Amino acid sequence: MSSSNNSVVYWGTGRRKTSVARVRLVPGSGTITINGRPGDHYLNFNPAYLAAVKAPLQTLGLNEQYDVLVNVHGGGLTGQADAIKQGAARALCELSADNRKPLKTEGHLSRDPRAKERRKYGLKKARKAPQFSKR
């Protein structure tokens, strides 16, 4: 068995829209791996997505101390990035109870409830009605 199996692993689950991310924090050098691929490649080098993923670690100043291993599915890249952010924040809370307050004030622990509204019958989309003709 390798020595990496003996290290402490912190788990967190994050959700956003239809995305679900299972995040593991392992003591390391700060690399981000998403679904077996480097984080910047998976997120198409988009600075907004990368910033969202790194935000909880940067809030606590731990961005070079833990490797982030992520398994994420569902939704698009925006939802996945925000799900990873929430999962990482929850894993950091598991690391130490003192981390909860700064993460909460920055909004990393809040679940964003916005989701796609369902389409209603008689309408073209969720709220778009067919053109109204008075006569």
Curated annotation (Swiss-Prot):
A Pfam entry, by short name: Ribosomal_S9
Basic and acidic residues bias spans: 97-115
SUPFAM superfamilies documented for this protein: Ribosomal protein S5 domain 2-like
Chain segments carrying region Disordered: 96-135
Extent of Basic residues compositional bias: 116-135
A GO cellular component entry from the record: cytosolic small ribosomal subunit
Protein name: Small ribosomal subunit protein uS9
Protein species of origin: Prochlorococcus marinus (strain MIT 9313)
Taxonomy of the source species: Bacteria, Bacillati, Cyanobacteriota, Cyanophyceae, Synechococcales
